[in-house]
């Protein structure tokens, strides 16, 4: 959807100015695309380990109750005529972006399933746990020219946890978000309401409230190079008519974008927006992005499907385009950098990785507040020597 300012907001936390810094030499990691143009690294086909839902009050449920079903308009009928402004602001309940959720919902799922993880309990000790949105930012970093980021990292029982921190600049932009941008964010969610049904075979109901607290999240296992990954990401809907109903290949990502009317506009779209769409969908193995193109009045009159594995073809011959190998190689390099930097096993010790466009990734070290992000309830529960439930069969 376009833009997703709040959607991944669940994965951020706001902090004050750095304090409690611990003296330590600060290594760095360059981000120049030319340094990462080697062959595409190994990336294990993502497999879904489970899922969870967040309800209208943002409460966690370890099930698929919030999953919606892809229900596009008939291809043989009149084209769509979706009014993306309908219901704004009267039927809009946006999530409170001041609430610092960090990794908490994913950690709830981990606590529920720690004894039944594919690969056994030893696998988690070697893994990196994070949100899909954080990995997406890493993938796009070599080509990003505007927005920096900060990632807090802590090691606990061997596992490396990564949680995004809202930068001061990002916070300032969010608090000063102009009305037009707030409306554009609503329009992206409204598009989902036009394209999704609550039950298989039923029709969408765009007359209801748009509540961005509600979310369905997939939890996935993968591996990039030598780095086992356990990450979660929000899923827009599942396609009951997909060739395979096995997650994540049945999932569909929904986006909106303004109509394009010139080759230059399309070229810019392929270079910038399509890169982010590719990174967001490639990581969890979502095969298709369905885009609704809106006119200046906020109506969607055309849809286009972008297969994730074919997105690179739009920029393959563009010297100013992006390269998937560069994205994945940089991400792998960052994960190696983080693994070798965060050595001490201490949930209250935080290495803060910071990056601004044009520079390298730098590191600072902090103890406890404001950067520590692993909650006490999670640390205590994982520390207790409780018997593990029986394993469930490993998903293929």
Swiss-Prot record:
Report the EC code(s) recorded for this entry: 3.6.1.-, 3.1.13.-
Residues recorded as bearing Phosphothreonine in the entry:
392
Query: Which GO molecular function annotation, any one, does this entry have?
Result: mRNA 5'-diphosphatase activity
Q: Which residues bind Mg(2+) 1?
A: 192, 236, 253-254
Bias class Basic and acidic residues marks the residues at 1-20
Whether Coiled coil counts among this entry's keywords is: no
Q: Per the annotation, how and in what number is the cofactor bound?
A: Binds 2 magnesium ions.
Residues given in the record as Mg(2+) 2 binding sites: 192, 234, 236
The region called Disordered is annotated at 1-37
The keyword DNA damage is assigned to this record: no
This entry carries the following GO cellular component terms, namely: cytosol; nucleoplasm; nucleus; plasma membrane
Q: Name one GO biological process term.
A: RNA destabilization
Q: In which tissues is it expressed?
A: Ubiquitously expressed.
Give the residues the record marks as binding substrate: 58, 101, 131-133, 217, 234, 255, 280
Q: Quote the catalytic activity from the record.
A: a 5'-end triphospho-ribonucleoside in mRNA + H2O = a 5'-end phospho-ribonucleoside in mRNA + diphosphate + H(+); a 5'-end NAD(+)-phospho-ribonucleoside in mRNA + H2O = a 5'-end phospho-ribonucleoside in mRNA + NAD(+) + H(+); a 5'-end NAD(+)-phospho-ribonucleoside in snoRNA + H2O = a 5'-end phospho-ribonucleoside in snoRNA + NAD(+) + H(+); a 5'-end (N(7)-methyl 5'-triphosphoguanosine)-ribonucleoside-ribonucleotide in mRNA + H2O = a (N(7)-methyl 5'-triphosphoguanosine)-nucleoside + a 5'-end phospho-ribonucleoside in mRNA + H(+)
Q: Which PANTHER family match?
A: DECAPPING AND EXORIBONUCLEASE PROTEIN, DOM-3 RELATED
Concerning its family, UniProt says: Belongs to the DXO/Dom3Z family.
UniProt-recorded name of the protein: Decapping and exoribonuclease protein
Q: Gene symbol?
A: DXO
């Amino acid at each position: 959807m376009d833009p997703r300012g709040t959607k991944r907001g669940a994965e951020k936390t706001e902090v004050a100015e750095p304090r409690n810094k611990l003296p330590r030499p600060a290594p760095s990691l360059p981000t120049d695309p030319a340094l990462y143009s080697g062959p595409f690294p190994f990336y294990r086909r993502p497999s879904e380990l489970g899922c969870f839902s967040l309800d209208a009050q943002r409460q966690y449920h370890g099930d698929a109750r919030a999953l919606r079903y892809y229900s596009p308009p008939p291809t043989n009928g009149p084209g769509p005529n979706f009014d993306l402004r309908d219901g704004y602001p009267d039927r809009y309940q946006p999530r409170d972006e001041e609430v610092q959720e960090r990794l908490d919902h994913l950690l709830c799922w981990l606590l529920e399933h720690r004894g039944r993880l594919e690969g056994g309990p030893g696998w988690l000790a070697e893994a990196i746990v994070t949100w899909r949105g954080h990995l997406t930012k890493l993938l796009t970093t070599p080509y990003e020219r505007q927005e920096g980021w900060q990632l807090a990292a802590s090691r606990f029982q061997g596992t490396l946890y990564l949680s995004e921190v809202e930068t001061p600049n990002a916070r300032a932009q969010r608090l000063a978000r102009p009305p037009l941008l707030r409306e554009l964010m609503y329009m992206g969610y409204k598009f989902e309401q036009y394209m999704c049904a609550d039950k298989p075979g039923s029709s969408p109901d765009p007359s209801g409230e748009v509540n961005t607290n509600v979310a369905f999240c997939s939890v996935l296992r993968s591996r990039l190079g030598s780095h086992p990954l356990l990450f979660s990401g929000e899923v827009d809907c599942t396609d009951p008519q997909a060739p395979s109903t096995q997650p994540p290949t049945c999932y569909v990502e929904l986006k909106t974008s303004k109509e394009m009317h010139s080759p230059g506009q399309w070229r810019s779209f392929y270079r910038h927006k399509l890169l982010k769409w590719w990174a967001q969908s490639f990581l969890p193995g979502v095969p298709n992005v369905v885009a609704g193109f809106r006119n200046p009045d906020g109506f969607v009159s055309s849809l286009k499907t972008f297969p994730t594995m074919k997105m690179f073809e739009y920029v393959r011959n563009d010297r100013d385009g992006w390269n998937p190998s560069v994205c994945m190689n940089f991400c792998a390099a960052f994960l190696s950098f983080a693994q070798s930097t965060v050595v001490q096993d201490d949930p209250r010790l935080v290495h803060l990785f910071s990056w601004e466009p044009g520079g390298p990734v730098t590191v600072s070290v902090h103890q406890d507040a404001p950067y520590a992000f692993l909650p006490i309830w999670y640390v205590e529960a994982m520390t207790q020597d409780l018997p593990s439930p029986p394993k469930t069969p490993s998903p293929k």
